[in-house]
Amino acid sequence: AGKIALKIYPQILTELSKEVRKGIFVVCGTNGKTTTNNMLCAALEAEGQKVVCNHTGSNMLNGVVAAFALGAGLNGHIDADYACIEVDEASTRHIFPRMKPNYMVMTNLFRDQLDRYGEIDITMNILEEMIRTVPDMKLIVNGDDALSAYMAMDSGNPCVYYGISRPVMRNETNEIREGRFCKKCGER
């Protein structure tokens, strides 16, 4: 649906996203994007808000456009208080020029995108560049993830942090933990 909508009307995402009344949330990160996005949507709907959401995790440009196009009524307009949109980190380059989010939720940043992007630093650079294009966007960041927290602190955007207040488990594992050390201070 998104690919066809973009062919017919290339500005569709820009136009429909402007009709969201209260705010647009984007959810990015390596793990938990779909779950976080759907929980956020459910919380807003439980408060009586009307929400556009890409529930199935179609998180690249065509999927985001499809969520908005399918959320439009027969009159071609969105009737939504909020939008909760899961976005693939690299796809922010295609989505942010068309849609200006009010909030970005960052779950974490790990090496899973290695097959697509080569290095975690490439993913971080893409996100940092796109965050700079929306200086008013409030970042809602997993403070327990050193890479996400560093990126938020370095961005200059307003931000709030969430996480676990104390360590639940301190057992060491053999898994690669590239986000284990802070890029700013080197601490765990």
Name every feature range the model reports, one short phrase each:
Residues 1-163, 167, 171-181:
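Phosphate-binding loop of NTP-binding sites
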Residues 183-187:
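Short, cysteine/histidine-rich loop/knuckle motifs that typically chelate Zn2+
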